[in-house]
Amino acid sequence: MLSISMNMTLAFTTALLGMLMFRSHLMSSLLCLEGMMLSMFILSTLLILNMQYTITFMMPILLLVFAACEAAIGLALLVTVSNTYGLDYIQNLNLLQC
């Protein structure tokens, strides 16, 4: 169980480093964000099953709901930006130009 927790922690930190390093494209940022959410889901599920917290069994499901909402909003933003500008650079997301 310890090796699975360490692997998921390593996956989270790798996705976080990817988010910090490859932040020029929106698609790569969304993929790193999904990797972070997936590792958080697996870690929370393992923690709940290992510690047998019966009160918090709904926490991983709520995390999946928020991840699905984040993915839908991110994909809608990606489609809008790529249709408007033709590129998926994050520099195009300047809110002052509205």
Swiss-Prot record:
GO cellular component: mitochondrial inner membrane; respiratory chain complex I
InterPro entries: NADH_UbQ_OxRdtase_chain4L/K, NUOK/Mnh_C1-like
Keyword Transmembrane helix: yes
Reactions that this protein is recorded to catalyse: a ubiquinone + NADH + 5 H(+)(in) = a ubiquinol + NAD(+) + 4 H(+)(out)
Domain of life: Eukaryota
Membrane topology listed for this record: Multi-pass membrane protein
Locations listed in the record: Mitochondrion inner membrane
Enzyme class name: translocase
Keywords: Electron transport, Membrane, Mitochondrion, Mitochondrion inner membrane, NAD, Respiratory chain, Translocase, Transmembrane, Transmembrane helix, Transport, Ubiquinone
One family name in Pfam for this protein: Oxidored_q2
GO molecular function annotation: NADH dehydrogenase (ubiquinone) activity
Transmembrane segments: 29-49, 61-81
GO biological process: ATP synthesis coupled electron transport
EC number of the protein: 7.1.1.2
UniProt xrefs under PANTHER family: NADH-UBIQUINONE OXIDOREDUCTASE CHAIN 4L (PTHR11434:SF0), NADH-UBIQUINONE OXIDOREDUCTASE SUBUNIT ND4L (PTHR11434)
Family per record: Belongs to the complex I subunit 4L family.
Role summary: Core subunit of the mitochondrial membrane respiratory chain NADH dehydrogenase (Complex I) which catalyzes electron transfer from NADH through the respiratory chain, using ubiquinone as an electron acceptor. Part of the enzyme membrane arm which is embedded in the lipid bilayer and involved in proton translocation.
Self-association state and partner proteins as the record states: Core subunit of respiratory chain NADH dehydrogenase (Complex I) which is composed of 45 different subunits.
The protein's name in its UniProt record: NADH-ubiquinone oxidoreductase chain 4L
Organism listed in the record: Cheirogaleus medius
